[in-house]
């Protein structure tokens, strides 16, 4: 395919135009008075959202250079969302501010590599200041406040705080769609471990890249599965039952993996395979934990069980299994509660008797997985559009609350960034490196200005006023009053703000140091077969 290529200012100008189109669509959603954006769907009703990453994903531009610019900024939003569950709009606003100011300086003759070094030094200093400002979360109310801001709904904040209170700060919280209206919290026996699907062909929900199995059988094998002949008897038995199959093994490869994938693609049989967690003796112990939780049996030569002789009563069961590329969650295993309690007390005894800190830590992880359970937030809504949007928002709020617990909270509403930006005034920087640091200093005011603009205020005036206020005080855009942000419950997780700043700076540095852009040349639109406007037939009238 032929390529288009642009250099220098023209290349960067195309990228910037694409970035601005995307950022302008996303930034209107920032703050408590942020607006909504309507997303047209190729089928079904349109979606109404104010979630930055959802809006960014929908934007596809015609111009090849603008398209690349928009894709780069999408990466900022997506990466921030993946790490922290929120801050996507803040990251986009920061990236736009840094790129705009940076390109102005590059056009004026600044050295892009010098600017990049200055930006990186300033971001490191501001990130460290944000971490220093962070306050550890101690109360349920603080968790509720953080999650409420992310979800823009106090009820959601309260239910997430309740869920974290029940399963612990490291516990598993999942969000499910419900047929009933409103929100409901349910605690179930469950376990999550850090192994994702072996092949993406197992995915059942392509939008979320998840494989979800309802009421599956669970095959637990302490060896590799490579022969389809060995696996076939158990597959046939499970297929006859009409249930899906979740396979946990040391590895699934070759014709066995191919057989599972082919059946999944054809739609004849739904299954997911993951590698067993842990190594050596620890893997054996974890597989036994899973077997007890699900009411199954570990298929192993050691206990005289071979794969080709497996019957359905040796398989585990669960209400649901959710597998992503990184982890698997078993919800509501069908194991006997007395056996689970016995296993828990056995692990507790092992913890007491262990004299190795490492072993004790791993045993405590197993105990948490087995005894902690899973909190399931069931969400319902009046329409499917609202349900999808609400579910996504709650999932983001859960990740946001976990980020707050992990690294603490800071004043929200763009205030912490503005006040931490003073750390970008680094002594010893000069020339283009100093200019790079000043770009970060100016960009750190952009989120607060945008929140003020969305609330109908003058951004520059608000930023100047907040800069003169005592630390931690800023604008409550919901009622246009200046308050102590933490006391008013306007807080952000430090991890969210830090990730947004670092990801924005990373992409800004890429923009500034780009000297050429190579894009696919759009193919000319072919005329439809047998086309023509039949003008040539005008003279046929005389033949009548």
Swiss-Prot record:
It catalyses: ATP + H2O + a folded polypeptide = ADP + phosphate + an unfolded polypeptide. GO terms for molecular function: ATP binding; ATP-dependent protein folding chaperone; isomerase activity; unfolded protein binding. The gene is groEL. ATP binds at residues 29-32, 86-90, 413, 476-478, 492. Residues 523-544 are annotated as: Disordered. PROSITE patterns: CHAPERONINS_CPN60 (PS00296). It comes from the Bacteria. Together with its co-chaperonin GroES, plays an essential role in assisting protein folding. The GroEL-GroES system forms a nano-cage that allows encapsulation of the non-native substrate proteins and provides a physical environment optimized to promote and accelerate protein folding. Its EC number is 5.6.1.7. This is Chaperonin GroEL. Keywords: ATP-binding, Chaperone, Cytoplasm, Isomerase, Nucleotide-binding. One of its GO terms (cellular component) is cytoplasm. The keyword Cell cycle does not apply. Belongs to the chaperonin (HSP60) family. Residues 529-544 have a biased composition (Gly residues). It is found in: Cytoplasm. GO terms for biological process: protein refolding. It comes from Cutibacterium acnes.
